């Protein structure tokens, strides 16, 4: 398992360079944000490389629960480098971006490699002070009862993208012998209504 994170500060104050290289990104982000949004900024990127045996299902979580900014104009694109079947793709809980914001997973926040172990509780709260527990409810155990949730996933080809709001509950299906490797690029953008 490998993860690289790059933040936009200093080298992409606005997304112009990225938009010049791939103009369809601007149109897609603008269509998601709506006509009332005037500006689009590049939030940052992540690169994930995951091989079979290097991890199990990435726990469901919301990126917004540990981000220092909020708003409706927040989107991430999950882009695979190889054909990725639905059974091994990103999984998003439909409508979960509408709330509530859950307490992030402690294991995922403190030691992502640990979540490879079987028997790890994927819902253990990261923020455990009494006021934090009241403000942010514990994550639901989606994997224990996936039929109770609107779990969305897709068959994707290289260059396809899944767009999701930072408050969407999402996790990654595991890689295994049937799909032994997954490489993905995540691009994030934000718009006018975001506050820090």
Give the residues covered by each predicted segment.
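Short beta-strand His + acidic residue motifs that chelate non-heme Fe in jelly-roll/DSBH
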Residues: 77, 164, 170-178
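Short, charged/polar surface micro-motifs in flexible loops or helix N-caps
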Residues: 52-54, 83-86, 161, 192-194
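Double-stranded beta-helix
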Residues: 85-169
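A short hydrophobic beta-strand segment most commonly corresponding to one strand
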Residues: 76-79, 94, 179-195
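Acidic, His- and aromatic-enriched active-site or binding-groove loops in soluble protein domains
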Residues: 62-78
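Histidine-centered catalytic micro-motifs
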Residues: 57-65, 168-172, 187
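Short, structured patches in soluble enzyme cores that scaffold and shape functional sites
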Residues: 46, 51, 62, 79-83, ...
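Non-heme Fe(II)-dependent double-stranded beta-helix
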Residues: 1-60, 66-68
């Amino acid at each position: 398992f490998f993860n690289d994170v790059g933040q936009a500060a200093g080298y992409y104050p606005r997304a112009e360079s990225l938009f010049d290289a791939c103009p369809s990104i601007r149109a897609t982000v603008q269509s998601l944000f709506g006509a009332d949004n005037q500006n689009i900024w590049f939030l940052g990127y992540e690169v994930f490389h995951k091989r079979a045996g290097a991890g199990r299902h990435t726990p469901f979580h919301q990126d917004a629960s540990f981000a220092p900014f909020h708003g409706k104009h927040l989107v991430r694109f999950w882009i695979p480098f190889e054909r990725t079947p639905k059974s091994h793709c990103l999984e998003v809980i439909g409508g979960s971006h509408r709330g509530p914001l859950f307490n992030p997973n402690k294991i995922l926040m403190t030691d992502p490699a640990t979540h490879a172990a079987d028997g790890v509780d994927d819902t253990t709260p990261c923020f455990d002070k009494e006021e934090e527990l009241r403000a942010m409810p514990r994550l639901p155990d989606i994997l224990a009862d996936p039929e109770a949730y609107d779990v969305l996933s897709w068959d994707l080809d290289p260059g396809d993208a899944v767009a999701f709001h930072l408050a969407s509950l999402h996790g990654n299906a595991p890689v295994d012998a049937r799909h032994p490797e997954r490489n993905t690029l995540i691009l994030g953008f934000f718009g006018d209504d975001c506050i820090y």
